A protein has these predicted regions:
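Conserved RNA-binding domains used in RNP assembly and mRNA/RNA metabolism
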Residues: 1-76
Length: 76
């Protein structure tokens, strides 16, 4: 849950049962893993479908991907 707390206000990707992937800004969550996303969009291959503000029921969540931060390697 700490990772979710650190991701509040940031973009995440949520994979749901049935293979659906949704990307959006994490606005909130609860202990049951119910998730509130703003600016959400469903990812369908190279296409996206705008969903806006949504609530995802926790028992449908398979995976939550935190924001990926690129850190270049230092050359020594």
């Amino acid at each position: 849950m700490e990772l979710l707390q650190e991701s509040l206000g940031k973009s995440i990707i949520v994979k749901l049962k049935g293979g659906v992937k949704i990307r959006g800004i994490l606005d909130g969550y609860d202990p049951h893993l119910n998730i509130v996303l703003s600016d959400a969009e469903e990812l369908k291959g190279s296409e996206t479908a705008k969903l806006g503000l949504i609530v995802i029921r926790g028992d449908n969540v398979i995976l939550i991907s935190p924001p990926i931060e690129y850190k270049p390697e230092e050359k020594g």
